[in-house]
């Protein structure tokens, strides 16, 4: 046994035994690590105290010296067999030189990588079979673990018993772990160098990557700063943030008095930013924008306050361009929307007018428009649109503003609309234009004779009647304040009807009386159809019977009043004279007044009268309605008298 000072590091060769660190009291180890995979640990009988030697992070373990101990000292002598083994004859051992070869050099995946990750050396065949616990009780400073001499020869013969022979133990999770490792490729024969430090939180290791493909084990030296810098390199920076940072850096350089120009300074910023893979493509795309900004800063050398107007100018230009494009595109759809709404409203109004107006009125309007148009053609006068003021200014406000828009071809439609609706109001006698005062002028000149130059004879036109029809039409349409296509179509149809031959008008005049005659017949038809012929004799008989019943009821009421007069409330007198009021065959036997002196006799007579006058009894006997009515009235009188008799008490 050899003891080394704590300042020295322990360097073990590939053929030496694995390093085992324990306290000087080696016989007092209280855990049998040879039985890690066989069940719960077994305590030795020689354990005296639960020292802290089993934990590698205790302060005492860090202070005491590192000791190289023989593996055989830790082997239990009275170990029980695990899974039926005999520990005396069968020993667990490192069988071949390439025991750890499958972890560090072989391409195929290792069987249990977790149990062989920190295997320290190739253990040659020895008498001590079981592996010792690897308690890495290392000092706080880094200690170099022996380099592994890996043989070039490989063997596929693996002992299945060595699966549980890993130097890892239950306490290895608390030990110091590998922090950095030198990567090597498959072609290189140099073994990897593994270093151990006391910072377990920096451990990053994967045996599936670096033994085969030569990928270096990424283990950062300084925990948070290095990780933040690494993550910052991989994360892409937005383009707007990059512009802001580059502008601020350039302004700082200009203020400090750097001799560099704006162009060169921003090129340096771009070079440094090209290291980031996420930003590279975005910066290449916006190279022209950066050059424009560079030229601006190179000329003005302004500060951060002067940079902001550039962004605002760009935003204003962009906004103005968008607003212009919006104006150019939205003029037509907005106007079309108004047209659609007006078309709907005008269709409703026109349909109502057509229903209200008769065919004779439509005939008069057609004749008047035809006469006015022929008069215009003969005299060659100007249109009413050019010479006359608009009848209602508020109605045609939109139409006057519409020609300014004129790009969409609305000007012609509006002018046609105004022409159509201003004919009746603006054209007066002799083709003169009339304004809003045309109504009053029409009153002053009630009638005018219009002489045609054609073959037609003179025709007298009643202008007040026509203007009464035409002038109300214009304000009705003024409410809409928008031209419509439906009204134009209908007016064009009217104009086409005006140009028909005179023979056609005569035929229409002949047809009108026939239509009026047919409508009158249609009105008369339902009058005859809706009536049914019924026999009224039965109803007359019923009425006669009802009248007879009413007379009989009156007679009964008079008879009852006469009988009850002076006897109301006197039960004895009513019962003694009951045979005078009841009909014959009622079943009432007269009772003399002398027999009803006592109270019991009165009670018996009253009960007999109730049996005769009760409605159920009358129903059984088949009494008539008049008899039932009489019995009801008599019963009411007897009931009142009986109540009065009970209040008086016995006599």
Curated annotation (Swiss-Prot):
Localisation: Cytoplasm
Gene Ontology CC terms, in alphabetical order: cytoplasm; mitochondrion
Residues of the J domain: 586-651
Indicate where the modification Phosphoserine is found in the sequence. Answer: 56
Kindly state the tissue distribution recorded for this protein: Expressed in leaves and stems, but not in roots.
Q: Where is this region: Disordered?
A: 1-56, 114-138, 156-176, 250-291, 308-526
Could you tell me the keywords of this UniProt record?
Coiled coil, Cytoplasm, Phosphoprotein
Where in this chain does the entry annotate a coiled-coil region? 532-562
Under the heading Gene3D superfamilies, the entry gives: DnaJ domain
* Location (main, coarse): cytoplasm
- List, as start-end ranges, the regions of compositional bias called Low complexity: 126-137
**What is the annotated signal peptide range for this record?**
none
Which residue ranges have biased composition labelled Polar residues?
1-17
Gene inactivation effect? Lacks the chloroplast accumulation response under weak blue light and chloroplast movement in darkness, but shows a normal avoidance response under strong blue light. Non biased distribution of chloroplast actin (Cp-actin) filaments.
List, as start-end ranges, the regions of compositional bias called Basic and acidic residues.
250-259, 281-291, 337-357, 405-416, 441-456, 488-497
Q: Please tell me whether the keyword Endoplasmic reticulum is annotated for this protein.
A: no
The role this protein plays is: Required for chloroplast photorelocation movement; chloroplast accumulation upon low blue light and for chloroplast movement to the bottom of cells in darkness, by modulating chloroplast actin (Cp-actin) filaments distribution, appearance and disappearance. May mediate a slight resistance to aluminum in root hair cells.
What is the name of the protein in this document?
Answer: J domain-containing protein required for chloroplast accumulation response 1
Recall the taxonomic lineage recorded for the source organism. Answer: Eukaryota, Viridiplantae, Streptophyta, Embryophyta, Tracheophyta
